[in-house]
Amino acid sequence: MRNAKLYSFSLPMEAGVVLRYQRLKTRDGFLVCLEQNGKQGWGEISPLPEFSHETLEQAQDAAQSWLAAWCLGENPTDSELPSVAFGISCALAELEGTLPEEANYRAAPLCNGDPDDLILSLNEMSGEKVAKVKVGLYEAVRDGIVVNLLLEAIPDLKLRLDANRSWTPAKAEGFAKYVNPQWRDRIAFLEEPCKTPEESLAFSQATGINIAWDETVRDEGFEVKAQEGVTAIVIKPTLVGSLARCQSIVEQAHALGLEAIISSSIESSFGLTQLARVAQWLTPDSIPGLDTVDLIKQQLIRCWPDVDIPLITLEQLKTVWQQ
């Protein structure tokens, strides 16, 4: 006997979270619960505004169709909507016991504002010092100055930068001018500096700054391949698709000597704890990009360790579908 439920959630965001051109006030999504033979499996379905192609309503419709078929004893193929495919594949993996419990909670701290705050937190960090800075939100020259300041202040720091395809080649060049050439090799990678992969590759070859693919992974026809200047593949499962799809990309990246990074799409604490398990399972030697729990004012059912943020329980969620 198979049963399934779909719960909806809407969690308030901290002020100032902007995705491309939209301020995000709440993080909305669904939790899916599968039940069979006295066991349960859970997953989160939360398309990310401005980044996911599917809307919340489309995700709900697709999830309900998949769940209805599953409850009738069918084994439907993965949804074509990445957020649905990922959430349901996590629920199936929990149900079948194939998603290991061990999690990788190491995080690359995210610098959202004052670089001095990041310097303080990194000075307290033991072991490998890795941090992430979003660039492309302000002037490219300012970004270059901030990155240079961080690399100068902390000699053993490795920086991950993310530009979200924000820059023209001229702006990317303006950024690089302000980063001391002798420190550029401590930029672990810069995700998607320019609007096209071709421009990003040219930027890397001109500046010696390593790059990583993120949005490109989700382009139609994407293939993992060795390219000069590309050192990493960033995988955001909510935007990429099922666990099997993510695992395939990780294995292809590792086979070519590229680093694979499991990264957040601002999921709830519930989704983040699952991503930490996925990261430990598929990329145990890499620090995942999951330092987003404090962007949301409430945690959801499962807590991120050592975080003092109020918790929403299952009883507080609305059931939107069950069978």
Swiss-Prot record:
Cofactors:
a divalent metal cation
Molecular function per GO: magnesium ion binding; O-succinylbenzoate synthase activity
Q: What name does this protein carry?
A: o-succinylbenzoate synthase
Q: What does this protein do?
A: Converts 2-succinyl-6-hydroxy-2,4-cyclohexadiene-1-carboxylate (SHCHC) to 2-succinylbenzoate (OSB).
* Top-level taxon: Bacteria
Q: Where is the active site?
A: 134 (proton donor), 236 (proton acceptor)
In what pathway does it function?
Answer: Quinol/quinone metabolism; 1,4-dihydroxy-2-naphthoate biosynthesis; 1,4-dihydroxy-2-naphthoate from chorismate: step 4/7; Quinol/quinone metabolism; menaquinone biosynthesis
Which pairs are disulfide-linked? none
Keywords (A to Z) from UniProt: Lyase, Magnesium, Menaquinone biosynthesis, Metal-binding
Record the organism: Proteus mirabilis (strain HI4320)
A GO BP annotation = menaquinone biosynthetic process
The gene behind this protein is menC
Tell me the residue numbers annotated for binding Mg(2+).
162, 191, 214
The record's top EC class is lyase
InterPro entries tied to this protein: Enolase-like_C_sf (IPR036849), Enolase-like_N (IPR029017), Enolase_C-like (IPR029065), Mandelate_racemase_C (IPR013342), OSB_synthase_MenC1 (IPR010196), OSBS_N (IPR041338)
* Lineage of source species: Bacteria, Pseudomonadati, Pseudomonadota, Gammaproteobacteria, Enterobacterales
By sequence similarity, the record places it as follows: Belongs to the mandelate racemase/muconate lactonizing enzyme family. MenC type 1 subfamily.
What PANTHER family does the record point to? O-SUCCINYLBENZOATE SYNTHASE, O-SUCCINYLBENZOATE SYNTHASE-RELATED
A Pfam family of this chain: MR_MLE_C
Q: What is its EC number?
A: 4.2.1.113
The keyword tRNA processing is assigned to this record: no
SMART domains in the record: MR_MLE
